[in-house]
Design a protein with these regions (language model features):
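Acidic, metal-coordinating helix/loop segments flanking the phosphotransfer/catalytic sites
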Residues: 40-58
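Alpha4 helix (beta4-alpha4-beta5 surface) of REC/receiver domains from two-component response regulators
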Residues: 72, 79, 90-108, 113, ...
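Conserved acidic carboxylate
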Residues: 17
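The feature encodes the CheY-like receiver
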Residues: 66
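Active-site residues of response regulator receiver
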Residues: 62
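Non-catalytic signal-transmission and effector/linker regions of two-component phosphorelay proteins
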Residues: 1-12, 107, 111-126
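Two-component/phosphorelay signaling modules centered on CheY-like receiver
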Residues: 20-39
Length: 126
């Protein structure tokens, strides 16, 4: 049976996005799914701080936050079993280090239906 939105209701999802309008869209989609939002954060230092303080059930991360990439933080999330979805305005997969190319990702601007489906699929796994 495929996961349903009920499977992620109450999950604490960390949002890292430095573009305010996109962050609001991400937050809206996740709230509609019944998730609790951590953030959104707009830089890597805040991402690390919020991750350590709240131990999220999932993370939706822009790969580039105010000119700094999030790739150094990803191993910590993955090691602790936190499901991650990468968001990016870049379609070129070669911009993502090889170790992280298999992570679920969605391109910006995103389709809200596709984002909802991806969030349910990925965040229901934990």
């Amino acid at each position: 049976m495929s996961p349903s939105p009920d499977d992620i209701r109450g999950r604490r999802i960390l949002i890292a996005e430095d573009e305010a309008m996109i962050a609001l869209d991400l937050e809206s989609v996740l709230q509609d799914l019944g998730c609790e939002i951590i953030g959104p954060v707009a830089d890597v230092a805040d991402l690390v701080q919020q991750f350590e303080a709240h131990h999220p059930d999932g993370a939706l991360l822009d790969i580039n936050l105010r000119g700094k990439q999030v790739f150094a933080v990803l191993p910590r999330l993955i090691q602790q079993g936190v499901p991650v979805i990468i968001t990016s305005g870049y379609d070129d997969v070669t911009l993502i280090p090889q170790d992280f190319r298999e992570l679920p990702r969605i391109s910006k601007p995103f389709n809200q239906t596709a984002l909802r489906e991806l969030c349910v699929t990925v965040f229901a796994k934990r």
